[in-house]
Amino acid sequence: MWLAILLALCCLTSDTHGARPPDFCSKDLISSVKPGFPKTIETNNPGVLKAARHSVEKFNNCTNDIFLFKESHVSKALVQVVKGLKYMLEVKIGRTTCRKTMHHQLDNCDFQTNPALKRTLYCYSEVWVIPWLHSFEVPVLLCQ
């Protein structure tokens, strides 16, 4: 008799119909955001645009081209929390009319329109940002 009453009470107080409630410390918890996993982020996010600019600046410092390149479009962006933020970007960059010998603001540089000088590259870059140290690193930059 007591067993029947106890079972009835358990069924009445359980809103999960016998299913186990989620344990917030277990791996069974279903979530769309998992700490440490890369997450898609809007390509027009200010952090993404700043990371893309750092990628282009690294590209400009590593090439012998006489003209500066700048980003024209970010097609894909992921962000991962790892002692700061790691951005993983797919960026289209293009040659500008600004020469490296002059110190230009990239925002003021127009893209080349001369077919002989026009050049577009598609890049994958990873940019590690540590905001509290005002630090930007570009450990991965692949362009073709």
From Swiss-Prot:
Q: Which GO terms describe its biological process?
A: immune response; lysosomal protein catabolic process; negative regulation of microglial cell activation; positive regulation of myelination; regulation of antigen processing and presentation
Q: Which first-to-last residue range defines the signal peptide?
A: 1-18
Disulfide-bonded cysteine pairs: these are C98-C109, C123-C143
An MF annotation (GO) of this entry: cysteine-type endopeptidase inhibitor activity
- What UniProt keywords apply to this chain's record, in alphabetical order? Disulfide bond, Glycoprotein, Protease inhibitor, Secreted, Signal, Thiol protease inhibitor
Q: Where is this site: Reactive site?
A: G36
Q: Which domain of life is it from?
A: Eukaryota
Gene3D superfamilies (alphabetical)? 3.10.450.10
Does the entry feature the keyword Membrane, yes or no? no
Coarsely, its chief localization is: secreted
**Chain ranges for the short sequence motif Secondary area of contact as given in the UniProt record:** 80-84
Cellular compartments annotated: Secreted
**What's a Pfam family this protein contains?**
Cystatin
- Glycosylation is annotated at N61
Q: Name one GO cellular component term.
A: cytoplasmic vesicle
This molecule's function is given as: Inhibits papain and cathepsin L but with affinities lower than other cystatins. May play a role in immune regulation through inhibition of a unique target in the hematopoietic system.
UniProt similarity note = Belongs to the cystatin family.
Name this protein carries in UniProt: Cystatin-F
Q: Which organism is it from?
A: Mus musculus (Mouse)
The taxonomic lineage of its organism, from the top, reads:
Eukaryota, Metazoa, Chordata, Craniata, Vertebrata
